[in-house]
A protein has these predicted regions:
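Proteins with a high burden of low-complexity, intrinsically disordered sequence enriched in S/T/G/P/A and R
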Residues: 6-10, 18-27, 145, 149, ...
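Acidic, proline/glycine-rich low-complexity IDRs
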Residues: 126-167
Length: 167
């Protein structure tokens, strides 16, 4: 995985996508969104923004909304290699998330993975580079993780979503 070739696209005023796209096989992706108490609401907004970015592509195929894309079954047959491939926030034990799930990392797991209970954006970006190496989640294709990202004042500023999807 070559995280050094990240692509940055800005959505709205603060959401960012840093993505890695491989040719064949799975792709890893990483997004930062403004912090929200509701991870599901943040994920839903992020997915809508990514769909809007790619709307011309899907529109050429007659798909005019994210809901229509999900209903069409398109993503099961031809994954988007992005956050469009996941849809629900879950809280479960590590490695128990299923396809389409984004598992929230909290508490001791955050400390274990990031070395601090309040990881900054830089810490998260560096740590997530290890995703898919067999010990950093998510462990399977078709799922993701998220965690709060903290500013210098110790308050959460962003949510980070990352995962591995594709064929």
């Amino acid at each position: 995985m070559n995280w050094a070739s990240a692509v940055i696209v800005v959505f709205g005023h603060r959401s960012q996508f840093l993505g890695i796209f491989g040719g064949m096989g799975a792709s890893s992706w990483l997004y930062f969104t403004p912090f929200s108490q509701s991870e599901q609401a943040a994920l839903d907004c992020l997915r809508e923004a990514v769909f809007a970015r790619d709307a011309e592509y899907y529109g050429e195929e007659g798909v005019e909304s994210l809901a229509a894309l999900v209903e069409s079954g398109w993503l099961e047959e031809d994954p988007a290699h992005s956050v469009l491939d996941v849809e629900r926030i879950v809280r479960c034990e590590p490695d128990m998330e299923g396809p389409g799930d984004v598992r929230v990392l909290e508490g001791p797991e955050v400390v274990d993975l990031f070395g601090t209970a309040q990881p900054s954006r830089d810490i998260v970006q560096q740590a997530v580079k290890r995703a898919g190496d067999g010990w950093f989640p998510p462990f399977g294709r078709g799922s993701g993780c998220c965690t709060a990202v903290y500013g210098g004042d110790g308050r959460p500023e962003e949510l980070c979503f990352w995962g591995t999807t594709g064929d």
